[in-house]
Amino acid sequence: MEKRVFRRKIYNAIGEWKRKSNGQTALLIEGARRIGKSTIVEKFAQEEYRSYILIDFNKASQEVKSLFNDLMDLDFIFLRLQQIYSKILYDRQSVIIFDEVQTCPKARQAIKYLVQDGRYDYIETGSLISIKKNTEGITIPSEEDRIQMYPMDYEEFRWALGDTATFPLLQIFWDKKMPLGAAHREAQKNLRLYMLVGGMPQAVNAYIDTNNLKAVDEAKRRIIRLYEEDFIKIDPTERVSKLFMSIPSILARNVSRYVPSSVIGEVEENKEMELLKSLEDSKTVNMSHHADDPNVGLPTTANYDKFKLYVCDTGLFITLAFWDKDFTENVIYDKLLTDKLPVNLGYVYENLIAQMLVASGNKLFYHTWPKDEKHYYEVDFLLSRGAKLCPVEVKSSGYKAHASLDAFSAKYSSRIKDRYLIYTKDFAREEETLYVPAYMTPLL
């Protein structure tokens, strides 16, 4: 299988850090495993520096790790690294990469003194950066700038397939609030392919190499098994793993919140919070919090005890939804490819939209309130735009019913800028509602 280095948007963000920091801070890139952190950082090092050393702390020898236990002689540390990795480092022209830095906390603590030394730049990558096991006994360096990295978004996926035209064109149509017309069907078909393959580079690579969704599914299963192994290292009782693996089944129930006890049973509140924090810190999930009083300052009204969980990648989500079934039994592949996804599988779109919104820089919030004694209204997502809110309702079909949007707009009319219904048909505007095809979600 050919190893490809895909074009990623974060490359420009790393370049911006290098220019602004000028050696005054290290850069920490956080994100789930297997999203391409190491690959893009190494590509940046190759193209933007005279030389680099990449230390993968998952593979590094004990000698390399022990170098960071005593920082009294930095000259010796740099000399040994150059010998071990057969690289020459040049003052202000080289970068040292700490890959999977969470597995060597002492190296992360050393960043403070390495940055102060000033000879080289430092880029760290990792996940599970903040959990107790990976921070116990060390001082977190303040000389760190952080960037969050995600699986390949829809535009990056199109780039990987050689399509650089779609998004500039979509932007034009969005700016003019125009439907695509005859081009809509093709645009929607392309989105459905992204939903199935997802944005994990290994899965995208498998698709490009084989044009075979079974091979793609196998690549995604390997990633999920890796996540399971990580979760078991954190919590040998497998509760973190269960919280992750159950996300599709919880979303399928269309309930207003994720209740951990329904998955792992009753545990002490502090322990439940610790398990959820570990899951969130793995960056494998996107968490949406309930906004009790939806207003422009959404975080200030967030209820952190009431939340929903989404899988960080649409492709992984689809594999996870049919985890116990053979690939041939995963009906989502066939139904999505043929555009016949039944309503009871609509949660696939909800997870997709959550991922798209997060990749576009949005924090996730939602809002529910009683309709009557047995039913409730729900706005799937709330976006903060200027001094106003944009409520978002997601449909997995072309239906234009939007009772929750209407009720929300009536209740909070003075707080609303635009109201969106994301669905599978072409762009349209009817009265106050903008009907947005799912592939335009990144432009909201």
List the model feature ranges, each with a label.
Residues K59-R92:
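Short glycine-rich substrate-engagement loop in P-loop NTPases that contacts/grips substrate
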Residues G162-Y349, K363, K374:
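Interdomain hinge/linker elements that couple catalytic modules in large macromolecular machines
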Residues E2-K3, K18-R19, T25, R34, ...:
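A cross-kingdom feature that marks ATP-driven nucleic-acid transaction machinery
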Residues Y113, S130-R146, R158-D163:
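Short regulatory helix/loop adjacent to the ATP-binding pocket of P-loop NTPases
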Residues K37:
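Conserved lysine of the Walker
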Residues I29:
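Hydrophobic anchor at the beta1->P-loop junction of P-loop NTPases
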Residues Q46-E63:
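Conserved catalytic segments around the Walker B and adjacent sensor/switch elements
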Residues I97, D121-S127, Q148:
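Structural recognition of the conserved hydrophobic beta-strand(s) that form the central parallel beta-sheet
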